[in-house]
């Protein structure tokens, strides 16, 4: 997984440079469709990196880097969905560097496996709701 995290970190850093370059030029036409077309597969891979360890080992992965990466994934997903309805130009200058840094944290602090089985639905619902509330 560290190779995938490094690749995603480079994609998010590249998107940050892409947005910064277009913001610096102050161009009237911004290639939003290009940005969202690059962001969609990156979000899909990022989501898979977050969910596959949980599904494979059937235990909850908790750690600083994992939690921060999950929260940033939620924020980027909200940005991606919101970009279809609202003009959110400029928000990416904060989100993409945060996403790259969160993936660095996830690689450095991968977390540990907690003994809570994911079959314990009330607890999983509680943890999921708390992460969603914090991330959104």
Segments predicted by a language model, with ranges:
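Hydrophobic transmembrane alpha-helical segments in integral membrane proteins
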Residues: 1-13, 132-134
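Membrane-embedded alpha-helical segments in integral membrane proteins
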Residues: 13-23, 44-55, 128-129
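Membrane-interface helix-loop junction between the first two transmembrane segments
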Residues: 17-37
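Cytoplasmic-side transmembrane-helix entry/capping segments in multi-pass membrane proteins
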Residues: 30-39, 65-66, 89-100
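A generic, lipid-embedded transmembrane alpha helix
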Residues: 38-54, 102-108
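Hydrophobic alpha-helical segments and helix pairs
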Residues: 85-134
